[in-house]
C-alpha cells in the first residue's frame, strides 16, 4: 500500500541532461524553452531542439576554428571581431550564409583592384635599370 511518494529502493541515479545524452556542449533544454516561448509553432517535438542545438554548436565550432587560425596568422592569442570577419568572409559557404550580416569592428577584406597595381612591365624595367 505505497502511496507512490516515498523511495522504496536505493536505485537512485543522477539525472542526465539531454545535452549529455546527445554528446553536446550547448544546452538542449534552453533551446527547447526558447523554441516554445518564441511562438514559432504551437508544438515543438522532442528531437527538434537536439537537432537545432547540434547545428548551432557545429557552426560555432567551425567559425571559432577559422577565427583562431586568422588570429594565429596575425600572431595574436586572442580572437577579436576582425578575426571573425576575416574567417567568415574568406570561407565561401560561411560568407554565403552570413552575407548580409554586419560584424561590428570587423573592418573589410583587403582588396586592391588590378588596375591600381603597378604593371609587370614597369617592374621588370625598374629591376633592369639597376
Curated annotation (Swiss-Prot):
<dbReference type="InterPro" id="IPR032454">
    <property type="entry name" value="Histone_H2A_C"/>
</dbReference>
<feature type="modified residue" description="N-acetylserine">
    <location>
        <position position="2"/>
    </location>
</feature>
<keyword id="KW-0597">Phosphoprotein</keyword>
<feature type="region of interest" description="Disordered">
    <location>
        <begin position="1"/>
        <end position="21"/>
    </location>
</feature>
<keyword id="KW-0234">DNA repair</keyword>
<feature type="modified residue" description="N5-methylglutamine">
    <location>
        <position position="105"/>
    </location>
</feature>
<keyword id="KW-0238">DNA-binding</keyword>
<keyword id="KW-0488">Methylation</keyword>
<keyword id="KW-0007">Acetylation</keyword>
<comment type="subunit">
    <text>The nucleosome is a histone octamer containing two molecules each of H2A, H2B, H3 and H4 assembled in one H3-H4 heterotetramer and two H2A-H2B heterodimers. The octamer wraps approximately 147 bp of DNA.</text>
</comment>
<dbReference type="GO" id="GO:0003677">
    <property type="term" value="F:DNA binding"/>
</dbReference>
<feature type="short sequence motif" description="[ST]-Q motif">
    <location>
        <begin position="127"/>
        <end position="128"/>
    </location>
</feature>
<dbReference type="GO" id="GO:0046982">
    <property type="term" value="F:protein heterodimerization activity"/>
</dbReference>
<dbReference type="GO" id="GO:0000786">
    <property type="term" value="C:nucleosome"/>
</dbReference>
<keyword id="KW-0158">Chromosome</keyword>
<protein>
    <recommendedName>
        <fullName>Histone H2A.1</fullName>
    </recommendedName>
</protein>
<comment type="similarity">
    <text>Belongs to the histone H2A family.</text>
</comment>
<keyword id="KW-0539">Nucleus</keyword>
<feature type="modified residue" description="N6-acetyllysine">
    <location>
        <position position="5"/>
    </location>
</feature>
<feature type="modified residue" description="N6-acetyllysine">
    <location>
        <position position="7"/>
    </location>
</feature>
<dbReference type="InterPro" id="IPR009072">
    <property type="entry name" value="Histone-fold"/>
</dbReference>
<dbReference type="GO" id="GO:0006281">
    <property type="term" value="P:DNA repair"/>
</dbReference>
<keyword id="KW-0544">Nucleosome core</keyword>
<dbReference type="GO" id="GO:0005634">
    <property type="term" value="C:nucleus"/>
</dbReference>
<dbReference type="Pfam" id="PF00125">
    <property type="entry name" value="Histone"/>
</dbReference>
<keyword id="KW-0227">DNA damage</keyword>
<comment type="function">
    <text>Core component of nucleosome which plays a central role in DNA double strand break (DSB) repair. Nucleosomes wrap and compact DNA into chromatin, limiting DNA accessibility to the cellular machineries which require DNA as a template. Histones thereby play a central role in transcription regulation, DNA repair, DNA replication and chromosomal stability. DNA accessibility is regulated via a complex set of post-translational modifications of histones, also called histone code, and nucleosome remodeling.</text>
</comment>
<dbReference type="InterPro" id="IPR007125">
    <property type="entry name" value="Histone_H2A/H2B/H3"/>
</dbReference>
<dbReference type="GO" id="GO:0030527">
    <property type="term" value="F:structural constituent of chromatin"/>
</dbReference>
<feature type="modified residue" description="Phosphoserine">
    <location>
        <position position="127"/>
    </location>
</feature>
<dbReference type="InterPro" id="IPR032458">
    <property type="entry name" value="Histone_H2A_CS"/>
</dbReference>
<dbReference type="Pfam" id="PF16211">
    <property type="entry name" value="Histone_H2A_C"/>
</dbReference>
<dbReference type="InterPro" id="IPR002119">
    <property type="entry name" value="Histone_H2A"/>
</dbReference>
Amino acid at each position: 500500500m505505497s502511496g507512490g511518494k516515498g523511495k522504496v529502493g536505493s536505485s537512485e541515479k543522477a539525472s542526465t541532461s539531454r545535452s549529455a545524452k546527445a554528446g553536446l556542449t550547448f544546452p538542449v533544454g534552453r533551446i527547447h524553452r526558447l523554441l516554445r516561448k518564441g511562438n514559432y509553432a504551437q508544438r515543438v517535438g522532442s528531437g527538434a531542439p537536439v537537432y537545432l542545438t547540434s547545428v548551432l554548436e557545429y557552426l560555432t565550432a567551425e567559425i571559432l576554428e577559422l577565427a583562431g587560425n586568422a588570429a594565429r596568422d596575425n600572431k595574436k592569442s586572442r580572437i577579436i571581431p576582425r578575426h571573425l570577419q576575416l574567417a567568415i568572409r574568406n570561407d565561401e559557404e560561411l560568407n554565403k550564409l552570413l552575407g548580409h550580416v554586419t560584424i561590428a569592428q570587423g573592418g573589410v577584406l583587403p582588396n586592391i583592384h588590378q588596375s591600381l597595381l603597378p604593371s609587370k612591365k614597369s617592374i621588370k624595367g625598374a629591376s633592369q635599370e639597376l
